[in-house]
Amino acid sequence: MQRKSGCTLTIRLLERTEIRWLVKELECRPRKSLGQNFVHDANTVRRVVSTSRVNRSDFVLEVGPGFGSLTLALLDCGAAVSAIEIDPVLAGRLPQTVAEHSNNEIHRLTVCNRDVLSFRRGDLATEPTALVANLPYNVAVPALLHLLAEFPSIRTVTVMVQAEVAERLAAEPGGKDYGVPSVKLSFFGRVRRCGMVSPTVFWPIPRVYSGLVRVDRYATSPWPTDDAFRRQVFELVDIAFTQRRKTSRNAFVKWAGSSNESANRLLAASIDPARRGETLSIDDFVRLLRRSDGRDDAAVRSASAS
């Protein structure tokens, strides 16, 4: 039987009652300190996978697989999955769950019992092409930014996060939700919201709605993507939003060395010094850095191509 997502139904997905059995078997309780809210609704995980558009050519990175609801749906599409799980009990049980729910899909799964923020490129033998996850609430933004920076091979991201986090990630300059996460995520690619997710599809039921967010990395980045350049841009973003109600001229005084130099650098980047940091786009921050360190557009394009 074929589904609209292009996946073939060969794996039995987890249901709520099975998750309750697993809780009893493992004698575990969701830990708020780890942001654990487990998705148990099959239609929701199918929706996430459909939004991600992953297929058998993809190597997917999943963060916080929990009991394996989303993991099974990803394997059902034919993708290979590397699941990063900080909870040793859940990490140890996941391969058995996959084996119990499928015929021969376990060979496409690897499980890493690690903190996602310490996960590095060298920890994987194969470069991931996609990130698909129900991100733990407590590390959603840092995990997302860390993995995009650490794994440039990731071309698409599809994640469930708290609704208010989803709004911040996809916010436009000048909006009430626009902030550091919005700007930094847009450094890597185009961000869009893909709908809301009801609290009732999780156990335990959270007090807030979740949102589905998709990121498509730029096919050709408009700016350099090396670590040094990214850190410099992000430094400017942090400065601007630490003092978001100040004019850009005043916010960047310490960075530029003086008020006059701050204004000169902003004007050189075609930015009105009276604008507030909360109105600046990622393009503005990149242009400000380029003009300030003496890079011209030709040099930047050359660096991007190398």
UniProtKB/Swiss-Prot annotation:
What protein name does the entry list? Ribosomal RNA small subunit methyltransferase A
Q: Give its E.C. classification number.
A: 2.1.1.182
Does this entry carry the keyword Methyltransferase? yes
**Location within or outside the cell:** Cytoplasm
Q: Sorted alphabetically, which keywords does the UniProt record give?
A: Cytoplasm, Methyltransferase, RNA-binding, rRNA processing, S-adenosyl-L-methionine, Transferase
Q: Which domain of life is it from?
A: Bacteria
Catalyzed chemical reaction(s): adenosine(1518)/adenosine(1519) in 16S rRNA + 4 S-adenosyl-L-methionine = N(6)-dimethyladenosine(1518)/N(6)-dimethyladenosine(1519) in 16S rRNA + 4 S-adenosyl-L-homocysteine + 4 H(+)
Q: Which organism is it from?
A: Mycobacterium leprae (strain TN)
**Record's InterPro entries?**
KsgA/Erm, rRNA_Ade_diMease-like_C, rRNA_Ade_Mease_Trfase_CS, rRNA_Ade_methylase_Trfase_N, rRNA_adenine_dimethylase, SAM-dependent_MTases_sf
Q: Which PROSITE patterns match?
A: RRNA_A_DIMETH, SAM_RNA_A_N6_MT
- Show the HAMAP family listed in the entry: 16SrRNA_methyltr_A
Q: Does the keyword RNA-binding apply?
A: yes
